[in-house]
Amino acid sequence: MNRQDIAVSRIFKGKWERDEHRFLVVTHARDVYMTNAVPKGHQAIGRQGFETALTDAFYEHIRSFARTAHNRNVYALSVYTDERHSFLLYLNTLEGFERTITGSPYYCSYSEEQKHDLKYSLGDFAFSYATFQGPFASQYAAYHDAVKALSAAGGPDGLEPYKGSPDLVRYVYKAELFEGGQFLTALHVTKRLLAQSVWLLQTTPDFAAFASSGSEYIDYSVVMRQTIDTERFYRIFPEMKSCDEAFQAAVEEARGLPYGEQVTYWWECVRENRNRQPDALLTATVRTDYQAVEALADVGAPILPAVMQALRSSVQQGDQEKAAFLCEVLLESGGLSREVLGEMAAAAEYAPPGDQEIRSLLTRTRQKLTGRL
């Protein structure tokens, strides 16, 4: 099971638990620390402030592009980010796309389907922007100092607390910007550019603006749909309408099964999706494991006893992957009771002796669920 796909999809859908009460301090010496309070005399840079600065920086790139002869038949704009927290702006025009594919040594062998796929492949876009000028350039560099420190420390809890003088502090960032926050930033900046900057561009009738996560399965199943209305989405990607219909038919068919069999059905879909086999449901319909989690969670409270029974069984068998999937279903579900939390605590007792990973999984999940009650 791909927990990263699940986490990123959940973030893009706005189902994200932000770290709102901690801050990262970046000193003039580029050292990075954690703190629970903003050092005196400083203001923390949060999501809104960072998004505004990034939007303004990309606006300048768009304005510069708009003044060139290339500003015609612009059909796509995308704000890209990934686990490395880089932010890139991509633009493409029909002419730029034509130059890209005709310049390829494989041009003569491209099918129409391949050409269409390349049309929205960011790596084949003719115009991209990854550098910044002015005050945001130093803020962005310090932001990446924090990213590197978090990676080296294994997360916020691995950073040392800041005990130095406020005079040594260069920037203070809210922790919500990191650990997945970059994906929400990319989406919000895309929406801002769509509202504030696209008027500068000479766009095509089917112009599309979208964020990108670096995973086509996440992008097509979740991300693009946040900024492209359904009618336009199907017009640009007609194959996705067939994928959506096929997946929805599978959802409706599964709903007719007994609850225990529904749990088994979606778990088997996740297992089949491990290696992206072309005939696997999630792969064939351009979905991720998140949609399997969501399909079960959407059934609601009636399916929870079957989920808990399957969880106890997977814990007893030491099947960490299946247990993790079922925990994700619980995290996606609403209306959980304290009784379910009690059952999770009891389920840990079924774990094989010495299997601390499953015990830790259940503890982390239970803590997250408890925080929602």
Feature annotation, model-predicted:
Residues 197-285, 292-306:
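Glycine-rich, aromatic-bearing surface loops/beta-hairpins
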Residues 68-107:
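N-terminal interaction modules that seed assembly of large macromolecular complexes
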Residues 265, 269, 283-296, 320-334, ...:
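Amphipathic alpha-helical elements of HEAT/ARM-like alpha-solenoid repeat scaffolds that form extended
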Residues 103-181:
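Low-complexity, serine/threonine/proline-enriched polar segments
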